[in-house]
Amino acid sequence: MGFKIRNFTGDPFAIATVSFGLIAWIVALAGAAASSQGSFPHFTWWGIAYQIVIILVITVLYLNNNIELYKFTLVGLVSIGFIYTTNSTNNLVYNSSSSGNLCCAAGCILLSILNLIWILYFGGHPESPTNQFIDSFSSNKYANEYIGRSSVLKTEPFDDQQGFNSAASKRFTSTGISLPQENVSQMSQTNTHSQQQQHSTNAANASNATSYFPLTQLHGLENSSQDMMGSAPRDLTQNTNTNSSGTKRNTLYTDSEGGTGITFRYKAKALYSYDANPDDINEISFIKDEILDVDDVDGKWWQARRANGQVGICPSNYVKLIDT
């Protein structure tokens, strides 16, 4: 998500409604300031102050690109503002003939119209015709492809021996251990053999696979990083991943499966934009309305593939299955 000006400027609905709201609020404030306070309804000042807070909150949510997460909250807040502005309009129009009061009433009428529009939009389902029509003008619909982070988030399998040798050497060198080249070659050959064996077995046997590297080939080096660095290394023998809360979550695919041998039977549409956790290489980022190929749709995390071929897992409450 993140605070970005283009999140706001790229949405014509946000620019139009917030700008309209600021103009209407200034008109109401100017009328209230010019009115005789003896005949001015004092509670209207609270309504004017409340309205500018709502406008600022909506602006900040658009700038952070998380307006979708607070739509239901905004419906309640804007509904309260709608009551304030309509009540103030009634008191200003019928209980006073002051030009300042009438100017403030005009601003409150404009704010009431704005609040009604926001209630209809934020209260509508993202798949409703009105919301779909409004969102179709947003340039953020297929923007922000997370190019800058794709190299970090994208999981690429080691399909060749040279790539595996390089990665294995870097992994053990970073812990201060010099790994002989023949051991690295032996490990890469074992990895190639395990990949071939995995593709030749059925899905049931593949799901029960518990070893990416045979422990006998590591010669006790599997715990070297923990001993020397004081932190637990990634568990290479279990198909699990540790999230930020410290609990292990089942990974929906292994490193050797990324990009090959996976059948995606369903398609899903992203209801909201999602930024992957940079500490979890298995998660993928996507944007609102993006179409994803998904499988293993049981549970809170689904296996997914983006249009650019990036494979990972996505939260199920951010996407919706669609008919193909």
UniProtKB/Swiss-Prot annotation:
Pfam families registered for this protein in UniProt: SH3_1
Glycosylation sites: 87, 95
Transmembrane segments: 13-33, 43-63, 66-86, 102-122
GO cellular component, as recorded: plasma membrane
The keyword Transmembrane helix is annotated on this UniProt entry: yes
Residues in SH3 domain copies: 263-324
UniProt xrefs under SMART domains: SH3
Stretches of the chain found on the membrane's Extracellular side: 34-42, 87-101
Gene Ontology biological process terms, A to Z: filamentous growth; regulation of actin filament polymerization
Function: Plasma membrane osmosensor that activates the high osmolarity glycerol (HOG) MAPK signaling pathway in response to high osmolarity.
Subunit structure: Forms homooligomers.
Protein name: High osmolarity signaling protein SHO1
Organism: Lodderomyces elongisporus (strain ATCC 11503 / CBS 2605 / JCM 1781 / NBRC 1676 / NRRL YB-4239)
